[in-house]
Regions:
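Short conserved motifs of the RecA-like P-loop NTPase core
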Residues: 169-172, 184-189
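Walker A/P-loop nucleotide-binding motif
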Residues: 46-64
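Short regulatory helix/loop adjacent to the ATP-binding pocket of P-loop NTPases
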Residues: 140-154
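A short hydrophobic beta-strand->loop->alpha-helix junction that borders the nucleotide-binding pocket
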Residues: 53-54, 79-88
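Post-Walker A helix-loop "phosphate-sensing" segment adjacent to the P-loop in P-loop NTPases
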Residues: 69-81
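Conserved AAA+ ATPase "SRH/arginine-finger" region at the nucleotide-binding site
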Residues: 142, 156-169
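A short, basic N-terminal segment
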Residues: 1-45
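Conserved P-loop NTPase "ATPase switch" module shared by AAA+ and STAND
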Residues: 83, 94-121, 128-139
């Protein structure tokens, strides 16, 4: 593990966006509930753990990084693990139950050994104050995981991130124009 911006934040060196912010994510109308739940996850110490599913490229990894980057967690021990890049290294799960927030990305890529370790981690999180945010390209009903692990994940608040609709494309362009300070005129867009 590598130290990052504070003595309390760690990550495994792959796919970690240290600048991700919820302010820079366009939440379509269909994703407003997810936006609200992420806000609760970050701001409410009693909030449920979250499972987010959705197709590749919809922003799941970005949202996990947004949560970890939030100022609310800046003084807490946080961890991001991308299962897709983990291979069979189950040793990474030793002593990670001391973290306040753990984001697990691409759980659909796990193998049986990792699933057993994830099951143990989820159990520890459920009995402690550790917050979990888990993502997958597969919907909860499509996951083929160790049954006990799947059962624990189903106890989490589960959401699917939805594709932006065609009628929201102009809003997305306006959003990006503002966020990136491009200042394109309406006529150009």
């Amino acid at each position: 593990m590598n130290k990052i911006t504070s003595s309390n934040q760690y990550f495994f060196n792959f796919k970690r966006d240290l600048n991700a912010s919820l302010d820079n994510f366009y939440f379509s109308k269909k994703n407003e509930i997810l936006k609200n739940e992420l806000g609760l996850f970050i701001n409410d110490s009693n909030a449920h753990n979250l499972f987010i599913s959705g197709d590749k490229g919809l922003g799941k990894t970005f949202l996990l990084n947004c949560a970890l980057n939030h100022k609310k967690f800046s003084e807490q021990k946080c961890l991001y693990i991308d299962i897709e890049n983990l291979s069979n290294n189950v040793k990474v799960f030793n002593e990670i139950d001391s973290f306040s927030v753990i984001c697990i990305d691409n759980i659909h890529c796990s193998n049986k050994d990792i699933e057993v370790e994830l099951f143990n981690l989820v159990n520890k999180a459920f009995t402690s104050k550790t917050k979990l945010l888990i993502s997958s390209q597969l919907h909860i009903t499509q996951l083929n995981l160790f049954p006990d692990l799947l059962s624990r994940i189903k106890q989490m608040s589960c959401f699917s991130i939805e594709q932006i609709s065609d009628d929201e494309v102009d809003d997305v362009i306006d959003f990006m124009n503002t966020k990136l300070k491009l200042f394109f005129s309406k006529e150009l867009i």
